[in-house]
Amino acid sequence: MNKEKEFLLWFEQMERGDVAIVGGKSSSLGEMTSKTDVPVPYGFATTAYAYRYFIEKSGLKEKMQAILAELTDVENSALLRDVSARLREAIMAEEMPEDLKAAIAAAYEELGKKVGEAEPYVAVRSSATAEDLPDASFAGQQDTYLNVKGAENIIAKVKECYASCFTDRAVYYREKQGFDHIEVALSAVIQMMVFSKAAGVMFTVNVATGDDSNILIEAAFGLGEYVVQGTVTPDNYTVSKAENKIVDRCVNEQDVMLVRKEGGDCEELPVPEAERNVQTLTDEQILELAGYAKKIEAHYGCYMDM
């Protein structure tokens, strides 16, 4: 298999060296699926080749170059907004090539067979596909779509990921850094949706102090997006790497949470009164998560956030 000429790759076909093909998020998910026993919700990713194929076959390249030529002053906020919006609109207005749509639809159907669920709910996320450009140069704030169901909806969200390559922020960054907008590419991760009672993030180093003796866990009720976005104040748990025990905890009040809606998409709901000041994770769950964090850090050989 020539990975560089495939429209998509399954997680077990990817590894950390595939950043240029499927981006940072996708390659890390592939690495953990194929090289570790850490549980990872299953899925696949579209490739940089698929993105460039879409841009080329749709004739978007020339349209985008013409629009970008009008961006004569990147410090002109109104002009930047206008150009960026027109670039996104141009992408969304084009039909994805039939063979690419068919490949995504077939992979989604195969995903359903593999997990034993017809038309499963998935998350669709963008993944930057170049090692020398940070995520800020690619995707916008809205580059994650949760609780998506059905092939047509997934194809539409993949296109929205492509369009997120041209947020005002992303265009400004690339202009200031001298990067070619047409040379960027984006991968979209299509991953089984986890309907979590609680979710959050973990760090194997305290980024504020540099202390790497503990695992730091932040968790809140509902889906993890509210933790990442800072919408809620999560619980904080500190686990000693050496002793494998919880050495500190801070349980914070949580009034709202993000949860899935039946049929697709998500909604904000109030946290039940009885749970608002309750510890989000059990001690057993905290220690299990810390164990995974240590495994991932050992595998990569560097500090990790996840």
Task: Specify the residue positions occupied by each region the protein language model found.
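Conserved catalytic alpha/beta cores of large enzymes that bind or transform nucleotide phosphates
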Residues: 214-305
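Short conserved micro-motifs at the rims of enzyme active sites and ligand-binding pockets
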Residues: 135-136, 201, 227-229
